[in-house]
Amino acid sequence: KKTSRLFTLVLIVLAMNVMMAIISDPVVEAVGCEECPMHCKGKMAKPTCYDGVCNCNV
């Protein structure tokens, strides 16, 4: 019985990791103004900030 509980825990952790990976995808990610230049670096971008949301303007 103990193994199934451990298995469930592992599944939950994996699911959380997948969710975090999806959420932290750059397309979805809302980057603050101060991180905007770093976030857009190397993308031939002109970073602008609108309503606290970073936009790379690639």
Swiss-Prot record:
It comes from the Eukaryota. It is found in: Secreted. It holds the Pfam family Toxin_6. Residues 1-21 form the signal peptide. The keyword ATP-binding does not apply. Keywords: Disulfide bond, Ion channel impairing toxin, Neurotoxin, Potassium channel impairing toxin, Secreted, Signal, Toxin. GO terms for cellular component: extracellular region. The keyword Disulfide bond applies. GO terms for molecular function: ion channel inhibitor activity; potassium channel regulator activity; toxin activity. Residues 22-30 form a propeptide. Disulfide bonds join C33-C49, C36-C54, C40-C56. InterPro entries: Scorpion_toxin-like_sf, Toxin_alpha-KTx_8/9. Expressed by the venom gland. Belongs to the short scorpion toxin superfamily. Potassium channel inhibitor family. Alpha-KTx 09 subfamily. Has the structural arrangement of an alpha-helix connected to a beta-sheet by disulfide bonds (CSalpha/beta). Potassium channel inhibitor. This is Potassium channel toxin alpha-KTx 9.9.
